[in-house]
């Protein structure tokens, strides 16, 4: 077999299909014109509207070499011969022009005549029910033993997203001859081995469209969509097993060797890192050139993940400063002639990469140290730890997955995703509000606010800065004028560490400023946001007054949170760690690591312990200590917090000791009463407790007492008999409902419903709308009616708060009609959903006004007017 470079293969492919009447088109952008896709993941993506029949093709035949990005198997990149995040897909496409015969014949011709691959090295696969494709391959001379029938999982392609064109496919494999395990008593084939037979070309016979519910619909025209991986073909044509050993990667790997002073193929572990960098730098280069920029959402986050994963592997190879931007040039030199956009954008790409590396490399080193401490302590990476590493140090989950895989650690990815979604939700809410809290304008002001709120709720201060509509002014005047003040001294606590900000008032000589929110945009500055009525000026003396009731309620809840944390560890075990908290005047919310829901007994024990500490009226002591000293003494530090050399320690005798900058009561007795109001799951391995203290607890108990009093009057029973009385009423209700349903069952006459039978093309069917019939009765009823008419039945039951749809299709009619699909379509009209088997299905809905429309749709389905 002759040797061919990747450039020669690419050109040979495109030229071959040009000669077959195909229009050669340039690669489309990696950013698809498709809201369902993050990136262009296959050669056919730019042509999806044509395959759908939504757009008429300009050319009936097209050939391309499409740049693609996929990151779904990113953890395998560098560890296997053929996984990549960026790759080039050669493709030839037919839009209602030729179909299977030509597609198969031309593919075989190109592989055997142009590439001159030995026929004895080639195998093919077909979809198990595609006899047409099987016969075409056989007539081309492929031995029957080398034509492998494979399942839908292997040989039915698409769609490239939740919806889109799809169809059966046929693949061409190259036999590398590599020794691999084979099932006992079987000869090796592409179906029963892994790693020996390399798929080099996939021919997709696109003839269906898959909708959002997974249903297949015939396309207006049959199409051909093929994909041949340039990297894989290059490996075969260059006589190597690993794609990374082809000329597509060699120049990039050489650049990595030079920049990082390492040698490829000298150390298996280092080789993985070199291959990861070689792959990822291609993705990064092309993504940025196509307009993707690093961010924390969408495509930008995918780019950031890939870039940071490459950076992590560089650090493993000894990199201590940015290096990836230096390797971009090797990608441009290798691929710039084919993709001129990366030549034009080279400088821009390098600057973006370097900037991103500078942001992350210091955090990476610190984060890796923390990961090591975590796994040394627990032997696993919890969802909480994973999220904190992501949130604090920018660690993508891929990096943690790599670390876990390399070292055999457990990683809670599902829990991490839950944390991430919660953060996104908070972010979405915050974006809808007016953003005063931007750092812009507060850096380098050369001023500082002294917080005195630990000791007093009132202070005399001077106004240092006034900000209105984002601009600093010398004075402000108005009614309900939104503005921000910075004081030299303040008793107002700025939101931090889970504790909400104080509220209150700031009084000037001629004005009153109502404090609604307090925050610290940069270290040392506290900003008061609120509304001004009257006048206020810079350098004016003002009186600050924190809302005492709210502050003291918050203090009670904050100290109670610390006590709760320790109580949880005593009752549940030392594995309990804080995973998040919120301290407000009205309640506290505490998230913690634990593997299961708390029992009623555990909740009672926790409440009792907390209340015992409260009743003992233990002094709450705060001290300033060095971080090392505090941790050495056993003070609990929170992973997400960034601590300085000296920290504030809040101690409740020997019961609780934590690093905390929040406000607390002087004595646990001030908390009054502690009551847990809910316990729930946040994510895998993380639970949440919500609780109240002080007067809020008393009000909670008073509300319960009032409820009991009402129940006593309604049930005419003493408090001790209320539960028994309710149980008796519920049992009576249940029995009455059974009696009602039995009466309904007897009143409904299946024979009368069966008389409504209609017929279309020898298919008998009945549709009937009933009132308040339960699902189990509907099932018996529909079986009876279907047996009577030997046909299809749709029953719709209007309940008080919902609609029940039941469909029955005789087995002999399921080739043309599917009960599950009918139920889905009908219930969708009714604003619901559901499904079932081809013979029986039930679904639900809620739009009673749409019942007529639903029955009309059913009749259209019977008449084949709707698929």
UniProtKB/Swiss-Prot annotation:
EC number: 6.1.1.7
Disulfide-bond pairs as recorded: none
Signal peptide boundaries: none
Main function: Catalyzes the attachment of alanine to tRNA(Ala) in a two-step reaction: alanine is first activated by ATP to form Ala-AMP and then transferred to the acceptor end of tRNA(Ala). Also edits incorrectly charged Ser-tRNA(Ala) and Gly-tRNA(Ala) via its editing domain.
GO BP terms in the entry: alanyl-tRNA aminoacylation
Gene: alaS
One Pfam assignment: tRNA-synt_2c
Compartments, as annotated in UniProt: Cytoplasm
Residues reported to bind Zn(2+): 558, 562, 660, 664
A GO molecular function held by the record: ATP binding
Source species, domain of life: Bacteria
Keywords of this entry: Aminoacyl-tRNA synthetase, ATP-binding, Cytoplasm, Ligase, Metal-binding, Nucleotide-binding, Protein biosynthesis, RNA-binding, tRNA-binding, Zinc
Domain notes: Consists of three domains; the N-terminal catalytic domain, the editing domain and the C-terminal C-Ala domain. The editing domain removes incorrectly charged amino acids, while the C-Ala domain, along with tRNA(Ala), serves as a bridge to cooperatively bring together the editing and aminoacylation centers thus stimulating deacylation of misacylated tRNAs.
Cofactor binding note from Swiss-Prot or TrEMBL: Binds 1 zinc ion per subunit.
GO cellular component: cytosol
Listed name of the protein: Alanine--tRNA ligase
Major location category of this protein: cytoplasm
Protein's organism: Fervidobacterium nodosum (strain ATCC 35602 / DSM 5306 / Rt17-B1)
Catalyzed reactions per annotation: tRNA(Ala) + L-alanine + ATP = L-alanyl-tRNA(Ala) + AMP + diphosphate
Needed cofactors: Zn(2+)
């Amino acid at each position: 077999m002759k040797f061919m470079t990747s450039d020669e293969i690419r050109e040979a492919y495109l030229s071959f299909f040009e000669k077959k009447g195909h229009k050669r088109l340039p690669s489309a952008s990696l950013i698809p014109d498709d809201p369902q896709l993050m990136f262009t993941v296959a050669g056919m993506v730019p042509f999806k509207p044509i395959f759908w029949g939504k757009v008429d093709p300009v050319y009936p035949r097209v050939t391309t070499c499409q740049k693609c990005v996929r990151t779904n198997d990113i953890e395998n990149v560098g560890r296997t011969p053929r996984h990549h995040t960026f790759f080039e897909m050669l493709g030839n496409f037919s839009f209602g022009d030729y179909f299977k015969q030509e597609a198969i014949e031309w593919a075989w011709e190109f592989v055997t005549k142009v590439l001159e691959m030995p026929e004895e090295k080639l195998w093919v696969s077909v979809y198990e029910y595609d006899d047409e494709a099987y016969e075409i391959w056989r007539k081309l001379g492929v031995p029957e033993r080398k034509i492998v029938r494979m399942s839908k999982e292997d040989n039915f392609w698409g769609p490239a997203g939740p919806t889109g064109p799809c169809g059966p496919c046929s693949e061409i494999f190259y036999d590398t001859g590599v020794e691999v395990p084979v099932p006992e008593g079987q000869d090796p084939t592409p179906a029963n081995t892994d790693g020996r037979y390399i798929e080099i070309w996939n021919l997709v016979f696109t003839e269906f469209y898959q909708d959002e519910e997974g249903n297949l619909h015939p396309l207006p025209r049959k199409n051909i969509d093929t994909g041949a991986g340039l990297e894989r073909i290059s490996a075969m044509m260059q006589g190597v097993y690993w794609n990374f050993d082809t000329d597509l990667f060699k120049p990039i790997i050489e650049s990595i060797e030079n920049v990082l002073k390492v040698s490829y193929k000298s150390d298996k572990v280092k080789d993985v890192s070199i291959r990861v960098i070689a792959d990822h730098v291609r993705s990064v280069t092309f993504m940025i050139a196509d307009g993707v920029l690093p961010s924390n959402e969408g495509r930008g986050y995918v780019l950031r993940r890939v870039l940071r994963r490459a950076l992590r592997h560089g650090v493993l190879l000894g990199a201590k400063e940015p290096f990836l931007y230096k390797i971009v040039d090797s990608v441009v030199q290798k691929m710039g002639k084919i993709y001129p956009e990366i030549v034009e954008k080279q400088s821009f790409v390098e600057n973006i990469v370097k900037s991103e590396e500078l942001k992350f490399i210091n955090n990476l080193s610190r984060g890796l140290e923390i990961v090591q401490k975590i796994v040394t302590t627990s032997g696993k990476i919890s969802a909480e730890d994973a999220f904190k590493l992501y949130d604090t140090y920018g660690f993508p989950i891929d990096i943690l997955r790599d670390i876990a895989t390399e070292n055999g650690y457990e990683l809670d990815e599902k829990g991490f995703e839950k944390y991430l979604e919660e953060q996104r939700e908070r972010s979405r809410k915050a974006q809808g509000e007016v953003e005063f809290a931007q750092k812009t304008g507060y850096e380098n002001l050369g001023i500082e606010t002294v917080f005195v709120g630990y000791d007093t709720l009132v202070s005399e201060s001077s106004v240092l800065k006034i900000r209105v509509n984002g601009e600093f002014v010398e004075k402000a005047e108005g009614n309900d004028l939104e503005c921000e003040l910075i004081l030299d001294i303040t008793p107002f606590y700025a939101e931090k560490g889970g504790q909400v900000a104080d509220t209150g008032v700031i009084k000037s000589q001629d004005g009153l400023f109502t404090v609604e929110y307090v925050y610290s945009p940069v270290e040392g500055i506290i900003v008061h946001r609120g509304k001004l009525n009257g006048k206020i000026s810079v350098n004016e003396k003002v009186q600050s007054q924190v809302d005492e009731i709210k502050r003291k309620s918050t203090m009670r809840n904050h100290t109670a949170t610390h006590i709760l944390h320790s109580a949880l560890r005593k009752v549940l075990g030392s594995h309990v760690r804080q995973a998040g908290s919120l301290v407000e005047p009205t309640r506290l919310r505490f998230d913690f690591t634990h593997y299961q829901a708390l029992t009623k007994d555990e909740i009672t024990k926790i409440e009792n312990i907390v209340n015992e500490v409260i009743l003992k009226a233990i002094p709450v002591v705060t001290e300033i200590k060095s971080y090392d000293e505090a941790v050495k003494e056993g003070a609990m530090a929170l992973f997400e917090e960034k601590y300085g050399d000296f920290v504030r320690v809040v101690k409740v005798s020997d019961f609780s000791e934590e690093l905390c900058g929040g406000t607390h009561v002087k004595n646990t007795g001030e908390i009054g009463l502690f009551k847990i109001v809910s316990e729930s799951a946040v994510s895998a391995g993380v639970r949440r407790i919500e609780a109240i203290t002080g007067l809020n607890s008393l009000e909670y108990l008073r509300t319960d007492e009032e409820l009991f009093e009402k129940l006593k009057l309604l049930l005419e029973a003493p408090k001790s008999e209320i539960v028994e009385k309710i149980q008796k009423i519920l049992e009576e209700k249940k029995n009455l409902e059974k009696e009602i349903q039995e009466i309904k069952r007897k009143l409904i006459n299946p024979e009368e419903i069966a008389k409504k039978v209609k017929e279309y093309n020898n298919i008998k069917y009945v549709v009937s709308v009933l009132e308040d019939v339960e699902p189990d009765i509907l099932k018996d009823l529909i079986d009876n009616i279907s047996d009577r008419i030997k046909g299809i039945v749709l029953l719709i039951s209007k309940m008080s708060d919902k609609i029940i749809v039941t469909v029955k299709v005789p087995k002999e009619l399921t080739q043309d009609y599917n009960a599950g699909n009918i139920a889905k379509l009908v219930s969708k009209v009714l604003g619901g959903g559901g499904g079932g088997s081809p013979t029986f299905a039930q679904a639900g809905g809620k739009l009673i006004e749409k019942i007529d429309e639903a029955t009309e749709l059913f009749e259209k389905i019977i008449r084949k007017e709707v698929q």
